[in-house]
């Protein structure tokens, strides 16, 4: 009896030690998310382990690894690390069917387990845009649909036009036949105009499996519209005698045919002076008969449009020459006897010292006009000098004052003055008396 009692005590003591040691042993795992087709790594750790075995099993409770021994024949499952404190395995080429709850077991008494959930993300397929048929007429209502399949969870679709997001769209989500992935579609409705021609409409698919790199589909719009026409003159102030070019700018899709020019609702009246070259109308040597309304008309398969230009030919402005005022020459009574001589060469030389170039640069770059003005001024100056010389020559002679006239030696004085002249003849005829 004593031996049996001691054996029982030993057994309970061993069990107590085992239970006490196992209280610090517990497997630790983490949930894993992986993209379909990727590789998932499942890790189970034990901080305190007294050589107790670890095991991984799949959602179907099939053992994958028991310590370092592979239990399931699946080439996709490999051992990463096996020790008393860790058991890690990898599952490559993960599919949607691999998703579920995996179990790590620590074989203590009792057995302790930890769960790790494997989430598999379904990658959405490249989106496709439908509903566009080229070409589209200006003003038509367009409906575009963007669709993508195979996403898990359901993907998000966004629309952009000219890099600006469009919010007013319709969104539809449908579950695929495998009941695991989704097909998502979005519809965009808008009315087009000519500004939409050549614009890229983008459908963008956002999903957590794409690693911040969204998938996109693009549709470039082709819009047909009637031409728009504008006439641009080569000068804003056409004058008589000048040339004028009228350019007809026309934009449309399809491209407009060659433009048609008319004047006042009829054909151009003077084809020799009014030459049409492409989209330009060239009018040579404008005159008053060219006044009128010119019309440019452009046509394509969608329609036609026109623009008008009213031509008014202005007169050439007259250039006024500067006038020169010649002062009148008057004589005043002289109270002393004076002999006056003239030297035309001296006056001419003093006048010729004027620099004609000083007049240049005052009235713009018309050198011919400036030269004419200078010539007129010089001519008038020379004429004035000539007339002044003739006047002084005719009045040259000997003059006596009243005092000289009553003096006794007046004849001698006259003779002295006459002799001083030397070259004068008939001095008596040159005498003048003032009373």
UniProtKB/Swiss-Prot annotation:
Keyword terms of this UniProt record: Cell adhesion, Cell membrane, Cell projection, Disulfide bond, Glycoprotein, Immunoglobulin domain, Membrane, Phosphoprotein, Repeat, Signal, Synapse, Transmembrane, Transmembrane helix
Glycosylation (residues): 31, 51, 291
Disordered: annotated segments: 337-360
Signal peptide as annotated in the record: 1-24
InterPro entries according to UniProt: CD80_C2-set, Ig-like_dom, Ig-like_dom_sf, Ig-like_fold, Ig_sub, Ig_sub2, Ig_V-set, Neurexin-like
Coiled coil, from the record: none
Disulphide bond pairs: 44-104, 146-203, 248-296
Domain Ig-like V-type: 27-119
GO terms (BP aspect): cell adhesion
Pfam family, one: V-set
Modified how: Glycosylation at Asn-51 reduces adhesive binding.
SUPFAM superfamilies documented for this protein: Immunoglobulin
Keyword Transmembrane annotated: yes
Extracellular side of membrane: 25-367
PANTHER family in alphabetical order: CELL ADHESION MOLECULE 2 (PTHR45889:SF1), IG-LIKE DOMAIN-CONTAINING PROTEIN (PTHR45889)
Stated role: Adhesion molecule that engages in homo- and heterophilic interactions with the other nectin-like family members, leading to cell aggregation. Important for synapse organization, providing regulated trans-synaptic adhesion. Preferentially binds to oligodendrocytes.
Name under which the protein is recorded: Cell adhesion molecule 2
Originating organism: Mus musculus (Mouse)
Name of encoding gene: Cadm2
């Amino acid at each position: 009896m004593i031996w049996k009692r001691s054996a029982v005590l030993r057994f309970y003591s061993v069990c107590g030690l085992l239970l006490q040691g196992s209280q610090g042993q517990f497997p630790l795992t983490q949930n894993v998310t992986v993209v379909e087709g990727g590789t998932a790594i499942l890790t189970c750790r034990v901080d305190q382990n007294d050589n107790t075995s670890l095991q991984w099993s799949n959602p179907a409770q099939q053992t994958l690894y028991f310590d370092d021994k592979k239990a399931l024949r699946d080439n996709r499952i490999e051992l990463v690390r096996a020790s008393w404190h860790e058991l890690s395995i990898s599952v490559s080429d993960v599919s949607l069917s691999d998703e579920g709850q995996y179990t790590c077991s620590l074989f203590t008494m009792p057995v302790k387990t930890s769960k790790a959930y494997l989430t598999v993300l379904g990658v959405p397929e490249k989106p496709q845009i439908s509903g566009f048929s080229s070409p589209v007429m200006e003003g038509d209502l367009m409906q575009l649909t963007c669709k993508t399949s195979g996403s898990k969870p359901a993907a998000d679709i966004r629309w952009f036009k000219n890099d600006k997001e469009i919010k007013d769209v319709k969104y539809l989500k449908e579950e695929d036949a495998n009941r695991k992935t989704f097909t998502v579609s979005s519809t965009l409705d808008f009315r087009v105009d000519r500004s939409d021609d050549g614009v890229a409409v983008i459908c963008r698919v956002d999903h957590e499996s794409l690693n911040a790199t969204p998938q996109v589909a693009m549709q470039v719009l082709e819009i047909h519209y009637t031409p728009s026409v504008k006439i641009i003159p080569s000068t804003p102030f056409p004058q008589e005698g000048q040339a004028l070019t009228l350019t007809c700018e026309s934009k449309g899709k399809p491209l407009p045919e060659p433009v048609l020019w008319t004047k006042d609702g009829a054909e151009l009246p003077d084809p020799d002076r009014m030459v049409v070259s492409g989209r330009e109308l060239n009018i040579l040597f404008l005159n008053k008969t060219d006044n009128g309304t010119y019309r440019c008309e452009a046509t394509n398969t969608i329609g036609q449009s026109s623009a008008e230009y009213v031509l008014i030919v202005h007169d050439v402005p007259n250039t006024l020459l500067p006038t020169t005022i010649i002062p009148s020459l008057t004589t005043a009574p002289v109270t002393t006897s004076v002999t006056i001589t003239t030297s035309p060469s001296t006056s001419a030389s003093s006048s010729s010292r004027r620099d004609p170039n000083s007049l240049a640069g005052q009235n713009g770059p018309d050198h011919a006009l400036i030269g004419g003005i200078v010539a007129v001024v010089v001519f008038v100056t020379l004429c004035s000098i000539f007339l002044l010389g003739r006047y002084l020559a005719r009045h040259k002679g000997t003059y006596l004052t009243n005092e000289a006239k009553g003096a006794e030696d007046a004849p001698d004085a006259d003779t002295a003055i006459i002799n001083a002249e030397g070259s004068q003849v008939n001095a008596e005829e040159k005498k003048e008396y003032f009373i």
